[in-house]
From Swiss-Prot:
Source species, domain of life: Eukaryota
Protein name (database record): Endo-1,4-beta-xylanase
Main localization category: secreted
Tissue expression remark: Expressed in larval carcasses and gut, and adult gut.
A family per Pfam: Glyco_hydro_11
Length: 217
């Protein structure tokens, strides 16, 4: 009987260090903000220790996004990431630094890797040139969403995309995003940000399947 108490404590610790989400949820976990959203289907999001998370999705989910990071975000953070991005070239998915600002309402992406669809092809968008950061070239495109879901309900708003060329690819990935470089370049093109809401290093899937296990710092 003397061994029951330490065994119970160990079991509670193991369970508490990992949490699987099946429904939309935001919050804080191990010092990081997290966000998980899906519009349908069986996608799951697992909160691991520290800045680590895992996402698992199939074609039963139309669209989902999840990640860990900070709330509020800022314009000068350097974000490091590493882990496994388990998709193939036919899967519609992004691996990106992702966030929102208000006043103006902006949804932004720094896309480090993607599958079958590049956001540089968004319809009705405008190409905003390219710049170099961290030894890579990023192509920039501004897109417009009309009457679309946002962090303040259904709205019309601009999206900013910085897309890494060449992309990181699939499988084991690692790198860093110096967000200040992107903010400065966007501003030089007349693409301002507003007051930061959340800022996460996210995995997103659209009508696809895959698995990601990513650590953010």
């Amino acid at each position: 009987m003397q061994f029951l108490i330490p065994v119970v404590i160990l079991c509670v610790s193991l369970v508490d260090s990992q949490k699987v989400l099946y429904n939309n949820e935001i919050g804080f976990n191990n010092g990081f903000y997290y966000a998980f959203w899906k519009d349908s289907g069986s996608a799951t999001f697992t909160l691991e220790s520290g800045g680590r998370y895992a996402g698992n999705w199939t074609t039963s989910t139309n669209n989902w996004v999840g990640g860990k990071g900070w709330n509020p975000g800022n314009s000068w953070r350097t974000v490091n990431y590493s882990g496994y991005y388990g998709i193939n070239e036919y899967a519609n998915s992004y691996l990106s630094l992702y966030g929102w600002t208000t006043n103006p309402l902006i949804e932004y992406y720094v896309v480090e890797s993607y599958g079958s669809y590049s956001p540089l092809n968004c319809p009705g968008g405008t190409d905003e040139g390219s710049f170099t950061s961290g030894g890579a070239t990023y192509q920039v495109r501004k897109c417009r969403r009309t009457n679309a879901p946002s962090i303040i309900g259904t709205q019309s708003f601009d999206q900013y995309f910085s897309v890494r060329t060449p992309k990181k690819g699939f499988g084991q990935v690692s790198g860093s995003v110096n967000f200040a470089d992107h903010v400065q370049y966007w501003a030089s093109k007349g693409l301002p940000l507003g007051t930061h809401a959340h800022q996460i290093f996210a995995t997103e899937g659209y009508q696809s399947s895959g698995f990601a296990d990513i650590t953010v710092s």
